């Protein structure tokens, strides 16, 4: 799959121009923002020292003409801390009449992710809305900078 191969251009092409993406770190509107997120994440994952930690497993893929769902487990180094993460994700999708992704919602345990990605701060504060807001704010800022770089 494009995701397993870290191919953000193909991933972005799967989304409708006005698609929406939401997870614990991002809330995005439009193919440009969503594609930018995938480019940013794939670029970080492909860096020397990080690429050998990347692994994606997926299962439970179900879809019809209007909606779908998938379960995946992503193994990677979190670029901000260099810590190993094993994120367990359940995604739901809706599709446009021409088969593009209209909405994409990923759900995962933020506290579990924070413990792995951030270490002690995530363990102590991963349950708190304030840490989640901080992570979302940082992710949005990083994406804005990444998109500005072209």
Residue ranges and their predicted role:
Residues 44-150:
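A beta-strand edge to alpha-helix "cap/lid" segment located at domain peripheries
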Residues 1-13, 17, 140-150:
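Short, low-complexity N-terminal intrinsically disordered segments enriched in polar/charged residues
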Residues 3, 38, 70-72:
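Tryptophan-centric aromatic hotspots in well-structured domains and transmembrane helices
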Residues 3-4, 30, 120:
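General structural signal for secondary-structure boundaries
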Residues 1-2, 24, 58, 89:
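Short, charged low-complexity linear motifs
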Residues 8-68:
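A solvent-exposed, acidic/Ser-Thr-rich amphipathic alpha-helical stretch
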């Amino acid at each position: 799959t494009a995701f397993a191969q870290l191919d953000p251009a193909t991933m972005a092409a799967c989304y409708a121009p006005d698609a929406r993406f939401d997870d614990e770190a991002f809330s995005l509107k439009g193919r440009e923002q969503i594609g930018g997120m995938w480019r940013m994440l794939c670029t970080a994952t492909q860096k020397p020292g990080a690429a050998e930690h990347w692994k994606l497993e997926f299962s439970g893929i179900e879809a019809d003409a209007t909606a779908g769902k998938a379960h995946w487990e992503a193994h990677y180094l979190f670029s901000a801390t260099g810590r190993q993460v094993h994120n367990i994700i359940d995604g739901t999708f809706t599709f446009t009449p021409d088969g593009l992704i209209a909405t994409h919602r990923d759900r995962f345990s933020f506290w579990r992710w924070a413990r792995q990605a951030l270490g002690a701060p995530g363990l102590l504060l991963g349950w708190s809305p304030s840490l989640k807001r901080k992570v979302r704010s940082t992710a949005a800022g990083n994406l804005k900078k990444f998109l500005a770089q072209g």
